C-alpha cells in the first residue's frame, strides 16, 4: 500500500499534490467533525489519521510501546524496513504483522533498481503461504487519483491463472481483478471478494489499496505490507476484509 493524505473538511476547495506523474485529488468531504490536523510546536501541520502501523506505535526507543507490541527497524538493499508485530487485540490496529518499507520515491524507481525490488519481494513473500494460488484484489476507485493505486496495480500484475494460460515454472498461479466501488457496482467489496474467494479458492487474497498517512513527506516512498487483512481507517466496515470474514489468509499491500 502507498499512503495518501486523509480527506479534509474544507468545502469548495480541492487540494492537488504531486504524486507519481499525476496530481492527487483530496476529496473535500470529512469523515469526522473534528479537525483532521494538529499544529506542531515548530509551526508544521500533522494529520491525525493514519493507516501506517509505524506511525501509530512510533520508533523503538523513542516512544513507550503498549503491551503486546514489538517494533524493530533494519536497513537492507537501500530500503529502511520497520516491522511492527501486534500480538493482542484491542489496540489501534488489528493483531498481525506490519512491514513498512521506506525507499526512494516509487516515481523514480524502475526495473533496474533490483535491490529495492528484491527486498520488497522478500518481505511480501514472507507473509504469503509458501505455495498455492493467490488472488490479487485491486481495491479503490480508478477515477479518483488518490484511490487508484489498486486498480492501476492490477493492470501490471503478471497473471498466470486461467484456462488459456501456460504454467510458468517457479511462479505460482495468480489471478487479478479490480472490483470497482460499490457506487458503480451496487455490491460491497466484502460481497465481491467473498464471491471470488468461494469460486477460485485461493491460498491467499492479496489486497492492494491506498493508505492514509499522517506525514505528507511519506507520499510515494512508503509501502506497507500486512497479514492482518484490509482495515482502512474509514468507518465503512464494508471495505474491511480479513481471514475471519473470508476463510482464507488476507494480506494488504
Regions from the language model: what does each represent?
Residues 100-104, 133-144, 176-180:
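Short glycine-rich or small-residue beta-strand-to-loop segments that form or flank ligand, phosphate
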Residues 177-178, 191, 207-253:
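A structural signal for small-residue-enriched, beta-sheet-centric alpha/beta enzyme cores
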Residues 172-197, 201:
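A structural-propensity feature for long, helix-poor, extended segments
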Residues 141-172, 176:
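Glycine-rich phosphate/diphosphate-binding loop of Rossmann-like nucleotide-binding domains
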Residues 139-149, 183, 210-214:
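Gly/Ser/Thr-rich loops at beta-strand to alpha-helix junctions
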Residues 1-9, 20-28, 32-36:
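Short terminal hydrophobic/aromatic SLiMs and anchors at protein ends
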Residues 86-129:
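An N-terminal, well-structured beta->alpha segment
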Residues 44-96:
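N-terminal amphipathic/basic leader segments beginning at the initiator methionine
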Amino acid at each position: 500500500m502507498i499512503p495518501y493524505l486523509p480527506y479534509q473538511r474544507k468545502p469548495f476547495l480541492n487540494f492537488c499534490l504531486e504524486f507519481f506523474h499525476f496530481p492527487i485529488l483530496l476529496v473535500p468531504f470529512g469523515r469526522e467533525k473534528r479537525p483532521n490536523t494538529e499544529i506542531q510546536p515548530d509551526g508544521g501541520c500533522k494529520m491525525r489519521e493514519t493507516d501506517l502501523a509505524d506511525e501509530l506505535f512510533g520508533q523503538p526507543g523513542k516512544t513507550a510501546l503498549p503491551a503486546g507490541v514489538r517494533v524493530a527497524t533494519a536497513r537492507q538493499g537501500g530500503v529502511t524496513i520497520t516491522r511492527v508485530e501486534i500480538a493482542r487485540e484491542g489496540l489501534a490496529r488489528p493483531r498481525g504483522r506490519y512491514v513498512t518499507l521506506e525507499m526512494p520515491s516509487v516515481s523514480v524507481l524502475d526495473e533496474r533498481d533490483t535491490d529495492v525490488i528484491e527486498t520488497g519481494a522478500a518481505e511480501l513473500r514472507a507473509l504469503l503461504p509458501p505455495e498455492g494460488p493467490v488472488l490479487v484484489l485491486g481495491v479503490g476507485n480508478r477515477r479518483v487519483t488518490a484511490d487508484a493505486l489498486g486498480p492501476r496495480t492490477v493492470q501490471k500484475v503478471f497473471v498466470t491463472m486461467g484456462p488459456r494460460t501456460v504454467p510458468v515454472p517457479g511462479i505460482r498461479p495468480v489471478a487479478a481483478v479490480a472490483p470497482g466501488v460499490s457506487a458503480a457496482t451496487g455490491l460491497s467489496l466484502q460481497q465481491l471478494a467473498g464471491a471470488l474467494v468461494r469460486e477460485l479458492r485461493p491460498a491467499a487474497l492479496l489486497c492492494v489499496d491506498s493508505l492514509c498517512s499522517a506525514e505528507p513527506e511519506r507520499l510515494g516512498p512508503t509501502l506497507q505490507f500486512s497479514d492482518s487483512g484490509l482495515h482502512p481507517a474509514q468507518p465503512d466496515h464494508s471495505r474491511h476484509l480479513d481471514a475471519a470474514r473470508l476463510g482464507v489468509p488476507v494480506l494488504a499491500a
